[in-house]
Structures are given as C-alpha cells and as structure tokens.
C-alpha cells in the first residue's frame, strides 16, 4: 500500500494491534494486485468491472456491494471500514447486514465550495447527487461513524450546506498527522551542487498538485514581483496537473511578468524529493485558498521557511515572522523574501522555530492513527466510544 498516510496508516496500526484484515480492492482501470509483508494474496480481494469505459465505472459499485455481501456471508467479520466515498456501497451493505461499519471520508472541499454557490433547495440537492453521488449518499446512510480530516476539507460545513441530519452516525472531524523528524534536518547553506539536492537561495518551491484551491498562480505572481525588483529567483511547482484552468493561469501569470523561463513544473515527485524541494529552497510557498493541509504540517516539520497568505487557516500554529512568514499582497511577499535573503541568520531562526512548533503542536502519525485504529476496535467490540473527541 502506498500514498498518503491516511490511506494506509490505520491498517498498519490495526495490524500492529493483532487484527486480521482483508482488503476489497476495486478500480475501473486495469490494476495489478501485489502482495506485501502484511497482506498475502488471500487477504486481497480484487473487484473488476465486467465492461470497460463508462459502463464499467457505473457497474463497479454494484460489484463492490455483491463482493461485500459474499464475504460477510462466507466468514465472520467484526467490522467493515470503507476508505473514501467510493466504498459507500460496501459500508451500506454491512449496515444492512447488521455488521459494525464506518467510512473514512475524503474529497469534500470542492463539493462544499461548488454547492454553496447554488441556491438551497432541489437544485442544490440535484447537483449534489449528480456530480458527487457517493459522497452525498454516504452522508445520508446509516453507519456507526464517519471520519473526515479537519484540514480544510469542509466536511463539517457540508452537512449544513446539504441540510443533513448527523444523527444517523457519529461524526469525527480530526486533524491530520505527518511524520515529523525528531531532530531538525540540517541544511548546509554553503554546499556546492544543484537544487533540489542542495540549498539554493534563489529558489522557491510550491509543493502540491496543480489545482484551483492550491493557487499556484499566486506563487508565479510572487516570482514576478521578485523579478520586477531585480531578484532572478526560480520557482519550482512540484506536483501533478489536476486542473487545466490553474495550469493555464500559471502560464498566463508567467507571461504577464515575463518569467516563463524561471517557472519549472516538475510533475509528481516522490515524497522524499518533495521534502528536498521544500527544505533546500529559500522558502516554500503556500498561497492556497486553505493552507491547513498535509503539506503545511510536513514542511514545518522539515524545518522549512513557509510563506503563506493571510487567510487565517493556520493561525493556531503560527507566530508571524518567527516560525512562518505571512503576507497580504504578492508585492509584500516579495519584499519579505528579499529581506530574508539578506538575513541568513533570521532564516535559520525561522527554520528552527518551525520545526519546534511541529514537534510541540502537531499530531504524530502514531498518535493520530492509533486513535483511529482504537476507535475502529472499540466500535467493533461494542465498547463505549463517548470519550472520543468529535473535533480535534
């Protein structure tokens, strides 16, 4: 298993507690199932559609429900846990069969942003069912609990937007967690070599998929303001392109400022390389619509200089100017970066304070996903779960 910790770490913690897990793996695309140290072939049940294209995508949830029903009839299971809204049919099947079950919800931010622009009533409900079918259904169906990440997902606001009664299940809205080095990674400011392997003071990074909510175009504008002031920085946009509109906005901003040759789109990179891009830049930029996301936790934990826009999404963690840089306009952001470039000792202090903040305030992977694993186990065994916080 690979990907974000939220997708695999709960399984890791459950296995460490002695649980046995079978995985129902489903995709409308051709995939190969590979064994791992923890999951043998008999633990991996692959579900494929019978048809290709749109028809295969439509029939896949029905196959998932059928496979879930077959598994639950064939042997005893204590719990069914659906990862992402695509698992709705499996969780729904378990609920109908009286098996304790829950859903880990993802992908709600865009849905909330889109639906709140539509007048409440049947038009909003119809759009939700049409464009966000399984998120909408999963929010209305019975289960023991639903868990969403309190990182700008807006899953809490979505209930009010849709007018959904939460009483059909417990709703948990918890912060995410990342792997934070116990010791601050050392950056050699005098090392010789090429970025991102070594520090380059005239490099900036923006880590994350190119998407509307990430606002890479704002980073390009900051770069443009630096060039207008005579500082030839380079900007590295590290992440896959998931929005053609944002990709075009970046190109347009680069053309407007005449900095196209200084904007580098690297595509998707391994996590270790992403950390290099962040750590070995003068600063890593977070100018998104909402910045309390995994990458914020990760780059702070790496002891990076983070430059974020003043949208208050990370206010609870930052001491402005001491562990993070905050700006209101792109011109102000450029001025702050120039000042930082000319004060290496201050940059080192900000890096040290960022890492200290991460150690003292962020949830570790073990604590956060240990809580999730224990919640699953307590729910499966019928124990009282009233002591689990609804919001972290």
What are these regions (language model features)?
Residues 81, 94-118, 125-127, 147, ...:
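Active-site proximal beta-strand in glycosyltransferases
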Residues 128-170, 176-180:
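A short, active-site helix/loop in glycosyltransferases that binds the activated sugar's phosphate group
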Residues 344-381:
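A charged, aromatic-enriched C-terminal amphipathic alpha-helix characteristic of glycosyltransferases
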Residues 248-268:
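Nucleotide-activated donor-binding/catalytic signature segment of Leloir-type glycosyltransferases, i.e.
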Residues 276-291, 304:
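Acidic donor-binding loop of glycosyltransferase active sites
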Residues 1-32, 363, 392:
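N-terminal subdomain of nucleotide-sugar transferases
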Residues 207, 234-249, 267:
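Glycosyltransferase donor-sugar binding loop
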Residues 148, 192-214, 220-223, 236:
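Conserved donor-binding/catalytic core segment of Leloir-type glycosyltransferases
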